[in-house]
């Protein structure tokens, strides 16, 4: 069967394919060297507009040494009056210069960092300007083709935007290379209800490819920004911090109740163990159905609750690979189990796998590899091997039908391969499966054929 990515920010992933990527920077200085070269290249090409933001993606300052962290002075020295905004890999904070801070209307201190809800609001302002819509459509088409080349037939899109109207417009323009479930954020939920939408409704003009998704809510922050809400303090951080909630428990419950009473599933981001407990408590009180997004650290007593409440765990196995060293650094004494994939499965929880692109690349084979082998390289020991999944479970969690084979009557969403992934024995080989994709079919139509 064709593959699904159950957690994407599809517009931001498309932009990533055409923006400065800072994922390999090992310090603030290295990131700024990459930025300096990028600015020089664009200046030489005549594509640098002083009225438009220069945007970079995916820096990981949680892995940088304490004396190699972002500062406002350092980024200002490199960028001058050119507005520059850099997004962290987890998209939960940004590093901006003074020119961008003024233009965005955000306050920055000595670090130059903007976090959580303030950053989410600011980030949405970065993609405005002449020609932006045409350029975005070009990038979106490239992103759909890139996904199809990996065997992907569908995504859940949790872009922070007017997602329903956006995808209706995109389908009307012929952007039809994927099935899309378009999520709705809490601040737009009432409008969606007033417009008569419910989870599962078909988007007009999509020819059955587009549907309204769940109400996506972010309950807490992230591990890399030390803002995931935990019941025990982060290791080595002064002053002591437990992370933060994006909404109060009362607000979380209120939004869940509103969604549930009006035909919307919920997709609630929860990373820290205490955030997961709060979200599960709210779901239990409201009868909400849908998924917990990430479920990165769970108290042992909470693991069986997802299955009991009928909630899926929407997991991103590549995050475990990216975070394994950060976990050791900041979750030294956790009250819960991080990345409890196997424990959730054994408890009867439905698993849905995704990337959270652009946090990790939109590539289900990468997610499957991380889930099965627990490491990116045969040269490194698996991370928590007891939580690894078998291949059949990982593959089934990456399809729309929840199984590894097609039957007569199934939708003709499929991927053809010239190698059998079930026989793969190394993470490197599983991660190279995209080169074995011969073709991808969506609703009986080829969206990718290898030449």
PLM region descriptions:
Residues 14, 98, 164, 168, ...:
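Histidine/acidic-residue-rich catalytic or RNA/ligand-binding cores of hydrolases
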Residues 7, 31, 97, 151, ...:
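Divalent metal-coordination and catalytic microenvironments
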Residues 243-285, 398, 402-421:
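Long hydrophobic segments that form regular secondary structure
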Residues 176-216, 291-296, 300, 326-352:
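Phosphate/diphosphate-binding loops
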Residues 363, 373-451:
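C-terminal cap of metal-dependent C-N hydrolases
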Residues 283-289, 305-314, 347-350, 372-373:
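Glycine-enriched alpha-helix->loop->beta-strand junction motifs that scaffold or abut catalytic
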Residues 1-197, 217, 224-271, 275, ...:
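Divalent metal-binding segments
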